[in-house]
């Protein structure tokens, strides 16, 4: 039989062996520096608004994605195109455009009131539903089919 001191010394080891505690690194190790347009503007292109493409290897490590050097080389032109496109978007002058909630509307335009409607042919609609359990409509599973 174990003494209390011996049992106390063994129990933490058993707990660690049966259920390891995962040590998560601090958030700072995922992103050594914040990713933003201001941190990725090259000094030479600061006036032109061009963005520097991110380091794919560092991003892949941060996202816990394995990326071979060949894959990184293949993705580099594609990422550069996306970054260039965002650089073009940053160069667009938006000062003369009024802000709106959605395209074609303004902040003072009114949308219809969101309120429930009753349908005259509700019974016909319910009869057409193959699997109806009042008040729910049962549909086939879409995600996680097994």
Swiss-Prot record:
Any one annotated GO CC term: glutamyl-tRNA(Gln) amidotransferase complex
Subcellular location: Mitochondrion; Plastid, Chloroplast
Region spans: Disordered: 28-53
Gene Ontology terms describing biological process: glutaminyl-tRNAGln biosynthesis via transamidation; mitochondrial translation; regulation of translational fidelity
Catalytic activity, as annotated: L-glutamyl-tRNA(Gln) + L-glutamine + ATP + H2O = L-glutaminyl-tRNA(Gln) + L-glutamate + ADP + phosphate + H(+)
Keywords associated with the record: ATP-binding, Chloroplast, Ligase, Mitochondrion, Nucleotide-binding, Plastid, Protein biosynthesis
Endpoints of the signal sequence: none
Gene3D superfamilies with a match to the protein in the record: Glu-tRNAGln amidotransferase C subunit, N-terminal domain
Enzyme Commission number, as recorded: 6.3.5.-
Example of a GO MF term: ATP binding
SUPFAM superfamilies with a match to the protein in the record: Glu-tRNAGln amidotransferase C subunit
Keyword Transport annotated: no
Family listed: Belongs to the GatC family.
Entries under NCBIfam families matching the protein: gatC (TIGR00135)
Function comment: Allows the formation of correctly charged Gln-tRNA(Gln) through the transamidation of misacylated Glu-tRNA(Gln) in chloroplasts and mitochondria. The reaction takes place in the presence of glutamine and ATP through an activated gamma-phospho-Glu-tRNA(Gln).
Quaternary structure annotation from Swiss-Prot or TrEMBL: Subunit of the heterotrimeric GatCAB amidotransferase (AdT) complex, composed of A, B and C subunits.
Misc. comment: This protein may be expected to contain an N-terminal transit peptide but none has been predicted.
Entries under PANTHER family matching the protein: GLUTAMYL-TRNA(GLN) AMIDOTRANSFERASE SUBUNIT C, MITOCHONDRIAL
Record-linked HAMAP family: GatC (MF_00122)
Protein name from the UniProt record: Glutamyl-tRNA(Gln) amidotransferase subunit C, chloroplastic/mitochondrial
């Amino acid at each position: 039989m174990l003494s209390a001191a011996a049992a106390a010394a063994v129990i933490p080891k058993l707990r660690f062996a049966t259920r390891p505690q995962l040590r998560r690194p601090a958030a700072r190790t995922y992103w050594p520096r914040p990713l933003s347009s201001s941190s990725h503007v090259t000094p030479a292109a600061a006036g032109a608004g061009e963005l520097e493409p991110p380091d794919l290897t560092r991003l892949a490590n941060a996202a816990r994605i394995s990326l071979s050097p060949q894959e990184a080389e293949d993705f580099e032109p594609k990422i550069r195109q996306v970054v260039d496109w965002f650089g073009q978007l940053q160069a667009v002058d938006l000062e003369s455009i009024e802000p709106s909630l959605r395209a074609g509307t303004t902040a003072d335009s009114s949308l219809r009131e969101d309120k429930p409607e009753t349908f005259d042919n509700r019974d016909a609609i319910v009869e057409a539903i193959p699997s109806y359990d009042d008040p729910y409509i049962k549909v086939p599973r879409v995600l996680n089919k097994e």
